[in-house]
């Protein structure tokens, strides 16, 4: 059973084993969260080369010692046996493992998501139908456009002011509930007066 969780990557080192399209997609997910990644493969999709210093590329076949210094390992090769070997080694070494072609061998899966600043909405079908996750993500991207990054930031700033201004928790909760019903322009007006 998988449990939805947001993972703090700040002090974690990540390696992706594989250099194809799926590995690139996984790499881009981590880069989207400001995390540099090491990628190990005997050959790379040319788009990896365009990523510059955000990615450390190791041009080699998988060897067990490569994963020693990493906390998170993504097995994204096109060889099921290699992916299984990586998963087995990661279990022995207590590394978090995601095997892209096997939910059963994975400690975690990476949900489809919509990210707007600090607003993060994860979508998962438990690996049953990724196309549905993609469809839902597309719908959510239209509802929660790029302006929601500013909206969340402004609500966060107002929340801090409300916490200082209202000592009564019930009253504070009611004010915050009312704020989230307002649009960004209304919030900007309120911010001027607090």
Where would I find each of the regions flagged by the language model?
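Short loop/edge segments at beta-strand edges and connector loops
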Residues: 41, 58-61, 101
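Alpha-helix C-terminal capping/helix-to-coil transition sites in glycosyltransferase folds
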Residues: 11, 68-70, 116
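Hydrophobic beta-strand scaffold residues
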Residues: 37, 57, 96-97
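ADP-ribose/adenylate-binding Rossmann-like module
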Residues: 72-76, 83-109
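Glycine-rich, highly charged phosphate/nucleotide-binding loops
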Residues: 50-68
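Hydrophobic, well-ordered beta-alpha structural blocks that scaffold small-molecule cofactor pockets
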Residues: 1-43, 48-50
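Residue-level detector of alpha-helix initiation sites
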Residues: 20-22, 81, 127
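An accessory alpha-helical subdomain
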Residues: 127-194
